[in-house]
């Protein structure tokens, strides 16, 4: 099969397409950086004074190389095989109803792991499917090589109020909208 990936991602994509088992995927080094669709904090005011209908998301969305964040114990890294643009991405790109950088700054103040989200860029995207490449030390249900579809709800599994209904969680967020490192990227 022919692929369209280039650089460090090529080996990962080739292995996935060829059906490599998890142990083979785990042996492939992850790149230090990867391509992601981002909005920039420095452009938050670019649409000030404009009507919503006149704001063009294409002006604010950029394909940029970003550094691979450190993997938290309760996270996984996936090679994104498919993603989409939904209303969260459009809102992020026109900075409405508010700029998402406030969400990232607030998350950044919560913990060591949250601090990774407070960046001068926001890698957007609340939808993705892909293949697990790494899992954090506290991940129990998923393993390298699993094919996954990512749900946008970002919930603290240690918050008891979210166990029966994730919408009741005190810190429930939307992944790729209120968190960084979303699905419109090579890795997430």
Segments (PLM) and residue ranges:
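Intrinsically disordered, low-structural-confidence terminal and linker regions
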Residues: 1-6
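A short N-terminal beta-strand-loop micro-motif at the entrance of redox/enzyme domains
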Residues: 12-29, 44-82, 121-123, 138
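Short structural boundary motif marking the start of a folded domain
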Residues: 30-37
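Charged, glycine/proline-rich intrinsically disordered loops and linkers
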Residues: 40-59, 96-118, 159-169
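Glycine-rich beta-strand-centered segment in the early N-terminal region that forms part
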Residues: 67-84, 97-159
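Helix-loop element at the rim of GNAT/NAT acetyltransferase active sites that forms part
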Residues: 87
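Cysteine-cluster motifs in flexible loop/terminal segments that predominantly coordinate metals
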Residues: 154-187
């Amino acid at each position: 099969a022919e692929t369209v990936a280039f650089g460090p991602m090529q080996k990962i994509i080739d292995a996935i397409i060829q059906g490599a088992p998890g142990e083979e995927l785990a042996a492939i080094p992850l790149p230090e950086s990867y391509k992601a669709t981002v909005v920039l904090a420095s452009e938050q005011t670019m649409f000030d004074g404009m009507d919503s209908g006149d704001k063009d998301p294409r002006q604010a969305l950029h394909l940029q190389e970003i550094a691979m964040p450190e993997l938290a114990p309760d996270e996984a890294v996936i090679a994104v095989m498919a993603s989409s643009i939904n209303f969260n991405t459009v809102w992020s790109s026109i900075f409405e109803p508010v700029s998402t950088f406030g969400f990232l700054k607030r998350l950044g103040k919560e913990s060591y792991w949250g601090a990774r989200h407070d960046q001068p860029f926001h890698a957007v995207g609340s939808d993705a499917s892909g293949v697990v490449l790494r899992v954090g030390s506290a991940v129990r249900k998923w393993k390298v090589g699993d094919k996954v579809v990512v749900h946008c709800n970002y919930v603290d599994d240690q918050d008891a109020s979210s166990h029966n209904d994730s919408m009741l969680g005190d810190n429930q967020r939307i992944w790729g909208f209120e968190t960084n490192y979303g699905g419109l990227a090579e890795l997430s």
